């Protein structure tokens, strides 16, 4: 059983994964699209603390790489359900179920024009 599954690989999800991995937890990040989430659609991110201005897609790649460097795993799946267990949780995905001790929901937002 994994320690933590993070649903969503945007900046919030990847940051959660990074900190959980740094704490020595086994971490899996599930994302159905590209790592970085909505930040990928930003041509230039100029206000991310500690980093110079860079394209949004590059920031997403950087965050994903940092989390992976610390031991987090990324997998491309769609989560279709979440069930509490005793202990932990079961996540149903398009590739089958997964179990974990803790889950972080960081699914972000939907772009509105």
Please report, for each region that a protein language model flagged, where it lies by residue.
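FAD-binding core/adjacent interface of flavoenzyme oxidoreductases
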Residues: 1-7, 23, 74-113
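N-terminal Rossmann-like dinucleotide/flavin-binding domain of flavoprotein oxidoreductases
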Residues: 40-97
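Glycine-rich FAD pyrophosphate-binding loop
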Residues: 5, 21-41
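N-terminal Rossmann-fold NAD(P) dinucleotide-binding loop
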Residues: 13-14
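Alpha/beta-hydrolase active-site loop signature
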Residues: 34, 43-46, 111
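Glycine-rich NAD(P) Rossmann-fold beta1-alpha1 loop
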Residues: 10
């Amino acid at each position: 059983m994994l320690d933590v599954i993070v649903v969503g690989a945007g900046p919030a999800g990847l940051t959660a994964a990074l900190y959980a991995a740094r704490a020595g937890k086994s971490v899996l990040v599930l994302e159905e699209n590209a790592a970085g989430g909505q930040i990928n659609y930003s041509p230039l991110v100029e206000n991310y603390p500690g980093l110079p201005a860079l394209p949004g897609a590059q920031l997403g790649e950087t965050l994903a790489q940092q989390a992976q460097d610390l031991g987090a795993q990324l997998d491309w799946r769609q989560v279709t359900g979440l069930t509490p267990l005793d202990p932990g949780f079961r996540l149903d995905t398009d590739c089958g179920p997964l179990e974990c001790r803790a889950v972080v929901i960081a699914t972000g937002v939907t772009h509105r024009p």
